[in-house]
Amino acid sequence: MKKILVIGATGKQGYAVVQALLEREYSVRAFTRNKENERLKALDSERLEIFEGDLNSEDDLRDAMSDVDGVYSVQPINRDDVQVELQQGRNIMKSAKAQGIEHIVYSTAGGVNRDRTGPHFEILAQLENELTDSDLHYTLVKPSFFMDNFLRIVQKDENHLYIPEFITPDIPFAMISTRDIAQIALHVFEHPQQYDGQSLEIASDELTLNQIVDTFETVTGVPTSIRGTFTSGTAERSWLEEKGYKVDFDLMTDINPDRLTLDRWIARQQW
């Protein structure tokens, strides 16, 4: 039975990976700053080990990587000091090399190393380059827009749903659920040689904002429209509109044939 270390195990993405691995009968070591994390403890699996550690500590990382077959890493964003992100990523790679890890699946973001600007994305690009230049067996997974973001940005007001305009409404963009990120990671761990050294920009659907509005209304039966704006910055919106995510959807179907398109994802939520 393979054992996988999941770094970032309490975040939405990492937690989904932990769940997917456990469902497929893997053993999982979940790396967290708090061993008493209620979400992890609620999984209540004899194949789950909760490991308390600090990404700033190479000793903690080496201990966490002992006797594991692979590593899934999704690092937390540090908005106060991106250099902390850089050093933590380097700690992960250095520890993986020291422990002879068979395969590391490293999650960054769609568009990294493809003109996506901003301190966080530039640090991720640097880490991608250092991983690519290392001797490690790795796969980069680069998620597109998170469908899960809609849980945060969609507003409900008197039986009406409102989605803010964060992109020109007739421009298509790719998106994915954390559930599907986990399924793709699982597939990579099951076929490590096939994806060794590859960079995968991943998604499960591609729609315009106008189509998203129509999809929400059709699935929920609740009138839906665009209201207000939401953006993490002018540069980020410009990148999404002018460059955007680049996803091979034929490959996505091969890797994840049961992928959640937006309508299927919406149907799983409470609105």
Predicted feature residues:
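Rossmann-fold cofactor-recognition segment
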Residues: D44-N56
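Short secondary-structure boundary segments
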Residues: Q75, T108, G228
